[in-house]
Design a protein with these regions (language model features):
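Conserved AMP-binding/adenylation subdomain of ANL enzymes
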Residues: 236-253, 261-302, 316-317
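Adenylate-forming
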Residues: 139-153, 258, 284-287, 300-345, ...
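Structural core segment of the AMP-binding/adenylate-forming
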Residues: 111-188, 521-523
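Conserved AMP-binding/adenylate-forming
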Residues: 331, 338, 342-357, 361-463, ...
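AMP-binding/adenylate-forming catalytic core of the ANL superfamily
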Residues: 120-130, 137-139, 303, 427, ...
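Conserved AMP-binding/adenylate-forming core of the ANL superfamily
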Residues: 24, 44-96, 100-104, 121-126, ...
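Conserved pre-ATP/AMP-binding loop-to-beta segment of ANL
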Residues: 25, 40-43, 166-167, 172, ...
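N-lobe entry segment of adenylate-forming
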Residues: 1-62, 66-81, 171-173, 532
């Protein structure tokens, strides 16, 4: 038994949060078994419609009973090679039915899941596997033109802790011969013996909600990715944010286009599905034609999408006119500031409410829903500021979280409108600390130092407005400029498809503003035209870009975040 990932939070915190009803003895595997008992033969999970193009197999559709049976059989396969409580299982799989099964099977045994994006190659996998001491690794035999199981087998000797490597896929997708040391497993119905053995194991050694359930990874946009262990406690608390804001219920059909490797995919889609017992439709990798087709074919009621995609779709009325969107009632978006015209456009033209999310693997969860902010412009710009007197919000976590803004220079709490400061949070959604010997991310009062810069807004200070990552601020002549604000405005230009704002080094001013953009087809853009467009937005002159760079694409990591450090490096060069 690996004890390294057990008992993440101190007893005093567990006692406090359980006494307040924020945490309970419930674990993820218990939630799954409860849904199976209630839902039975109802549809649970659906494969990507284009699965045959990705792996060669036919898409699958499973009921809750079928899903449970295959989960039990897979758990038996893990158990047979000695995997158990506290072991870390590296997972690199696309969004399929089998990925759902791997997670649920591992958690039924107390195994810690560490998911990695499909885009990661041997270098990234080796680094994270050794950081987290993977005991086993599960992937797929093929994905497009890649052979992931073969890739892992080739670096196995460089991961001393790795005892087992699995290729998990339907029998039709498993090759006749796998690389040496790779065990092939296929979905199959559980035997009565496997069912009874798992029942005994769960009864005699149940999961502890304070034990690690996952080790996800920070995006590595600023430095080496950090491991983020999270227990059942934090996951089951934070999932209420992404259930309450879109008001997800058992009758919903969720379309998941985000890789299930971090907060966006796991908490944005997977856990709301599991907690409510609705239908989960998987999608991967992103393909706009398939995505829109799934919305129509599966009668999807809720999905998530990045702001750039929503803006692009809104500008292409002919594309949307060809799709039946009548079932779709809301869309989640976020990670970067939303453009008010985009949020307003979806609401006014299609009656679809866009929900603004801001989250992190560590446990940030700010959200603006139509229930709390009916005005789409407010919803794009602001988040509820929890704890303000005489203001109540619709989500459970708004009553659970403590939120502060702190001046990054003086360390003093900020209470006035319009003063930028670092967001710091405390509450039942927040993790216990990074994997390994990392500096503590918490301040002297136990609040998570997020590194995100916000300001208080609203007539009564009831809102928070995101400005930018602290490390991304451009400081021009002593004035702080938030790239995110500029990016949101530049993205409204009809020629701009994608944008990142960075600071160019300057000997006199310290930094000057540079805009790096990609353009829409058959458009052009000059710096003077962009500056004129921004002047019409009535922004301060010191924020205006002094350099415009046009690229074919912007560098992004595996989860879609722009790698500004690469843009800065090329700017310096």
């Amino acid at each position: 038994m690996n004890k390294a990932h057990r008992g993440l939070h101190p007893r005093v915190k567990v006692d406090e949060y359980t006494s307040k009803g924020w945490w309970s003895d419930e674990t993820i595997d218990q939630v799954f078994r409860a849904q199976v008992r209630v839902r039975g033969d109802e549809l649970a999970v659906v494969d990507p419609a284009n699965r045959s193009e990705l792996s060669g197999g036919d898409p699958r559709r499973l009921s809750w009973n079928q899903l449970e049976s295959e989960v039990i059989a897979l758990a038996a396969g893990f158990s047979e090679v000695g995997l158990g409580r506290g072991d870390v299982l590296g997972v690199q799989m696309p969004n399929t039915v089998e990925l759902v099964e791997v997670y649920l099977a591992a958690w039924s045994l107390g195994i810690v899941v560490s998911p990695l994006p499909m885009q990661y190659r041997e270098r990234e996998v080796e680094g994270m596997a050794n950081q987290a001491a993977f005991a086993a690794f599960v992937t797929v035999p093929s994905f497009g033109d890649r052979l992931p199981a073969t890739e892992i087998a080739a670096i196995r000797s460089r991961i001393p802790s790795l005892r087992s490597v699995f290729a998990y896929a339907p029998a039709s997708e498993l090759p006749a011969q796998l690389p040496a040391g790779v065990v092939g497993l296929s979905p199959r119905a559980a035997t009565e013996t496997q069912r009874s053995e798992l029942d005994v194991r769960i009864t005699e050694d149940p999961n502890n909600p304070n034990d690690a359930m996952t080790i996800c990874w920070t995006s590595g946009t600023e430095s080496e990715p950090k491991g983020v262990p999270r227990s059942h406690y934090e996951w089951l608390a934070i999932c209420w944010a992404t259930i309450d804001a879109p008001d997800i219920g058992v009758g919903d059909v969720l379309l998941n286009p985000f890789p299930m490797v971090n907060m966006a995919g796991i908490n944005g889609m997977f856990l709301p599905w599991l907690r409510t017992g609705c239908v989960l439709v998987q999608h991967h990798p992103f393909d706009l034609r398939v995505f829109l087709g799934q919305i129509e074919a599966e009668r999807v009621t809720y999905t998530v999408a990045p702001p750039a995609l929503l803006w692009m779709l809104l500008a292409d009325e002919s594309m949307l006119a060809a799709v039946d969107l009548s079932s779709l009632t809301r869309i989640g978006s976020g990670s970067v500031p939303l453009q008010p015209p985009m949020v307003r456009g979806w609401q006014e033209r299609y009656g679809i409410g866009v929900i603004n999310f801001f989250g992190s693997n560590e446990g940030i969860s700010l959200l603006s829903s139509p229930a709390d902010m009916p005005d789409p412009d407010d919803r794009a710009r602001y988040f509820p500021r929890f704890g303000v007197e005489n203001f109540r919000w619709s989500t459970r976590i708004s009553d659970w979280m403590d939120v502060r803004l702190v001046d990054v220079v003086t360390g003093e709490d900020i209470t006035e409108v319009g003063h930028p400061g670092e967001l710091r949070i405390s509450g039942p959604t927040v993790f216990a600390g990074y994997l390994g010997d990392r500096p503590s991310p918490f301040d002297e009062r136990g609040f998570l130092c997020t590194g995100d810069i916000f300001e208080i807004a609203g007539d009564h200070g009831q809102f928070l407005r995101y400005l930018d990552r602290g490390k991304d601020l451009v400081i021009r002549g002593g004035m702080n400029i938030a790239p995110a604000e500029l990016e949101g405005l530049i993205a409204e230009h009809p020629a701009v498809a994608d944008v990142a704002v960075i600071g160019d080094p300057d000997e006199v001013l310290g930094e000057r503003v540079a805009a790096v953009v990609t353009l829409r087809p058959e458009t052009e853009l000059e710096l003077d035209a962009l500056v004129a467009f921004l002047k019409d937005k009535r922004i301060a002159s010191y924020k205006l870009p002094e350099r415009l760079e046009i690229r074919k694409e912007l560098p992004r990591n595996s989860t879609g975040k722009i790698l500004k450090r690469e843009l800065r490096q090329k700017s310096v060069a």
